Structure formats: C-alpha cells, structure tokens
Amino acid sequence: TEDDIKNEYRKIFLTKNSVESILEVQHSNDGNYDTGNGHKLDRDAAAPHFTGTIAAYTPTQNHVDEYGMREGYTYDKNNPYVGRDYRFYANVLYDGSEYNGHKMDIHYTRTGNTEVAGEDLTQYGESETASYTRTGYYMGKFVDETQKIDKDETYASKQNYIIWRYAEALLDYAEVMFRLGEENTALA
C-alpha cells in the first residue's frame, strides 16, 4: 500500500546504521536530554502541533514541485497531492496528511471578513520561539514522530544523520557513466 511504501522509505532515515547507509553521523543519545549526544532536529523541524517545537525548517513550494507524478497520474489542481511520487508522502507534511495519528490542518478558512487559521497554523506550547509554517508545509523526512518534545532546550533527538546512502552511490555512478558517454552502462 501507499502507507507501507511511505513508512519503509521513512525508516531508511530513522533506523540507525541501515543497510541503505554508507556513512552516518552517529548519535548515541537514548532520547533523554540529560545524557547528551543527541540533536534538536525533531524540536526544530516538527509541526507545532507536537508542543515545544519551532517549525524552523519547512519545505518550500519549489521543493514540493520537484516531486513528480507517478506513472498514470496527471496533475489535478483540485487534488494536488494525489498520485505524487511516493517519496513526497514521506518527506512532506501537507494539509490533510496524517502524521503521528494527527490529520494536518494547514489552511485558512474565510467566512465573510473573518479568516480562521487551521489548527496547524497556530503557535503551540510554551516556547517563545515557537512558530508555524510560512510555506504551507512541514518537514516529515528525518523527523521521528515518536520523539517526545517538551522543552526548547531539548537535544533529545536520537536518530543518526545519513550523509551518504547506497542508492545515492548508484545514482552517482550512473551519472558519471552517462557523462563519459557510457550510456548503456549508465542505464544498466
């Protein structure tokens, strides 16, 4: 199913020392702020619905547009998120997407002269630095939705950061072969 594909892809970036990984920055933190060796990605990138986050990293429309349509699908401006490349669903949280049991509400509703922000366009938590998306999207890639975030100073994120993946090495090799005029090798 689409959810299975999305979840398998997301696991590549959340599983320590995955078979897909060639080089990773290791984080030995057990998810507890006090033990150190963690990082703040979950706090800095997660949608504000998850309390204590600041939504500092959000995908832009240009980034979203890079995800093409799957074979057999055409772009529909009334349903722009249907039929996208599977990686889109793992990497980008958009209005109506499911994340950690929560349906993302990232839109404005106008009633007469009143404009009401969706739940995920509202600042949450105690954070003075809390923010919300300015692009209409939140980051899904690399973010561990099971990570509990409860304070601004948290360095409790524990997932490793993949610098180089096996799939990237294969694509790099194919590109080099193509540029050297070895098109058959590149396509093999």
Residue ranges of each PLM-predicted region?
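Active-site beta-strand/loop architecture of penicillin-binding DD-peptidases
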Residues: 119-165
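Extended, hydrophobic/aromatic-rich amphipathic alpha-helical segments that build helical scaffolds
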Residues: 1, 23, 88-93, 160-188
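Extracellular/surface-associated beta-sandwich interaction domains
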Residues: 62, 66-68, 142-143, 156, ...
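An aromatic- and glycine-enriched ligand-binding surface/loop that stacks and positions planar moieties
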Residues: 1-122
